[in-house]
């Protein structure tokens, strides 16, 4: 292995037996017909399970709703993108010319997908207990900081409560674009809010994720503006 990849494996805290799994996890679909989306699918499920299991044992008296909200906070795209930046993943991603030109190595969705793909790759290279230890090590500070309660509500819920508390109409979400094939789509959603000059746009791999992204941006604009 060359030294840049060795640096990445040190950051990840895991030495791969099969280097090709790591290479595949870092390969975006824009770069090659063999890419990281199957690994991402696997890693997404493993991450959700590992975090759910940890929350269940860490918070024995917390109800299902709060645990679901805490898990959503920990596994959402921007949290994964933060992890990706901490690892310096953008320097190692294999992207096609178009994505490189448009700064894909900085994009939250691409970084988040790569983190999930790496989780899938670690699992295939080892086993569930090893990948559990790796993931929990990555999440140490976030697991220590997270608490049950209102702050874990998803963005759509928080936006709705924000508007209701000010006696304003509820937001209207409209899908304005869907691109890609059925198994690999990107949804674009506009969130219209009374009193805002223009709709807020969110994107995601499902309608729900796009709506949540739009709601998060709308909340930022409303609270910071």
UniProtKB/Swiss-Prot annotation:
It is an enzyme of class 3 (hydrolase). It is found in: Cytoplasm. One of its GO terms (biological process) is mRNA processing. The keyword RNA-binding applies. Residues 5-127 form the RNase III domain. It comes from Vibrio vulnificus (strain CMCP6). This is Ribonuclease 3. Its main location: cytoplasm. GO terms for cellular component: cytoplasm. It catalyses: Endonucleolytic cleavage to 5'-phosphomonoester. One of its GO terms (molecular function) is rRNA binding.
